[in-house]
Amino acid sequence: MKTAMVVGGGIAGLAAAIGLRRVGWQVRVMERAAVLDDAGAGISVQANGMRALDVLGVGDAVRAVGAAQGGGGIRIPEGKWLSHMDAEAAARILGSPVYSFLRADLHRALRSALPADCLVTGVTVDEVVRTADLVVAADGVHSRRRAQLFPDHPGAVYAGTTVVRGVTSAPVQTEVDIDQTWGHGAEFGSTRLLDGRVEWHAAYNAAEGVRHDDLLSEMARRFGHWHAPIPALLAATEPGAVLHHDVYELRTPLPAYVADRVVLVGDAAHAMTPHLGQGASQALEDAVCLAAYLGSEATIDEALIRFDRERRPRTQAVVGAARQTGRIGQQLQGRFAVALRNAGIRITPSSAAVKAMVKYALWEPPALG
């Protein structure tokens, strides 16, 4: 039986392990944290990610802990709508709505698909040592494996955006399922969770590394005067349910996702800004494609060559599209520039938003052998 070592026990690593086991590999997941991640706020998975989960055999289990998202749109801080998303039309084309989860619930659903002895926690893999037929580097945006394989690559760089994420402690009534508000160099978004609580994020331009002693008070200062229900969402959130992190991306594309028999997946390969909401879905696509090619190609090397050939162009295009979306959306500053953008969005038909989503979420997964 072929063996694989997966470095990293996040969503990308767990999904890769599930896929490899489904095509007959023996897999061990190595995670630095002493306890596999139950932290985090919310996360959304688009139709392509849901199709990947179905191929991996965990789609139903994941849907059971997620909330299918209906309508939504973009508005300005005063509350006026710039555009609406026809979620039903998008779901008809894509075959699935967007699902939103507590990250911890999605993580647990993936973990439950793996035997306990597959997961090894509290270990640090300082360097890639070939003790398996394949090493899957799923160790995130600041991947050590990537740095070892491509020492001349500049690595992840700060994208100019910092993000605060929270989850309300009780259900909060919202007008739509997916609500996104664009201001000047700032964005506030929210999605409904399965139990009626709301996951929210506040993204804004800031210098790298700036932190605040009272994060919720800072959010109230920045966003408390924006339209309802934003003040209510902040008021319904406990300080312990708030996370703050800077956004990093691989602005310089990697020359390859494969070196010898080490393959990079997820953020280790193609870290992107969150402005398209495609990060998790692209990692899930990676997992399916890697397993499918290893199950169908004659040799491991041929499978990895195919993975690199097919995944690198698609994911790097998504990285670029996410960056561009952020530049014209959340990151845009200047009264004239913002007014021009808003006017352009108002006269754009709602079908354009559906087309923009479909461009990256429409994906036909390969079958697992």
Locate the predicted segments by residue.
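Glycine-rich FAD pyrophosphate-binding loop
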Residues: 21-41
